[in-house]
């Protein structure tokens, strides 16, 4: 999607656009319309089932707004490291929490909180501790990104069936609990 367009247009990168939710044909048609089909290769991949790439192939493995759905175990990050060249990077940008709720979900968030959110929305400290367990990487950046409010505002103006519920959730959240997390690790 947009991250593929950015990487191709800004950096001239060749991108393997691995997606679980959008068909390769749909992505290819989009890439062709955008004039990037010569640099963007759409593929269907479920990262939890293994990746169809050679070890040491990639300079960068990047996940925007998806890693939290599948990368919440120490084993997942460890399984990705071999695909990145020594000196290359693994980078993610994901929604998260300013602090762990544990069993103390704030009252205003309880109507929206569910088991998927409990599993996938974690704090920066939680993610840093998880990534620190991995062998073969050095964490070079981990922070709360300043674009959290902008990212949510853009999402809330999108046409998607769950946006209506998310609007209510974000009104209740009021900027108190959510953040957007960036993690970058260098493969050593």
Residue ranges and their predicted role:
Residues 1-49:
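Class I SAM-dependent methyltransferase SAM/SAH-binding core
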Residues 15, 90-91:
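A short hydrophobic/small-residue beta-strand
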Residues 49-61:
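A short acidic, Gly/Pro-enriched loop at the edge of an enzyme's catalytic core
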Residues 59-74:
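A short SAM/SAH-binding and catalytic strip from SAM-dependent methyltransferases
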Residues 74-89:
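A short glycine-rich, Lys/Arg-flanked "PGG" loop and its adjoining helix->strand segment in the class I
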Residues 95-118:
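Short, glycine-/aromatic-enriched active-site segment of Class I SAM-dependent methyltransferases
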Residues 119-135:
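Short alpha-helix
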Residues 138-188:
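Conserved Class I S-adenosyl-L-methionine
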